[in-house]
């Protein structure tokens, strides 16, 4: 994949990505940061940590700002991914809740596959 995800709002990174037509998902959390990321040209605001306020926060942000794409990360798992999508997230990102470090270290592909399937089923249930 050719894209950039930033941990924080970095207008200079957004500008550089726009110059080279690279999609950029800018880190943001507060409504001000989210709007600033969008106005700077980010394709979406990466809302982190999403688990802090949960799907209700995404829904609350989308109400007055329906034009801004939100990408919740941090605390997204197979049990709540559907709730984030129903709340208005255009996509989500997951790390350790999808690929557990122990399973990766042990090359437990079955466990990783099972988690991926659980995520896929949860997402499919929303469509």
Identify the residue ranges that each predicted region occupies.
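Conserved, mostly hydrophobic/aromatic
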Residues: 45, 84, 119
């Amino acid at each position: 994949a050719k894209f950039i995800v930033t941990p924080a709002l970095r207008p200079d990174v957004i500008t550089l990505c726009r110059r080279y037509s690279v999609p950029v998902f800018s880190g943001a959390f507060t409504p001000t940061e989210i709007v600033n990321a969008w106005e700077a040209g980010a394709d979406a605001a990466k809302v982190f940590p999403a688990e802090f306020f949960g799907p209700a926060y995404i829904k609350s942000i989308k109400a007055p700002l329906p034009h801004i794409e939100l990408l919740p990360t941090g605390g997204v798992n197979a049990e709540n991914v559907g709730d984030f999508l129903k709340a208005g997230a255009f996509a989500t990102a997951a790390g350790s809740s999808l690929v557990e470090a122990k399973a990766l270290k042990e090359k437990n592909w079955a466990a990783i596959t099972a988690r991926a399937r659980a995520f896929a089923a949860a997402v499919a249930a929303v469509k």
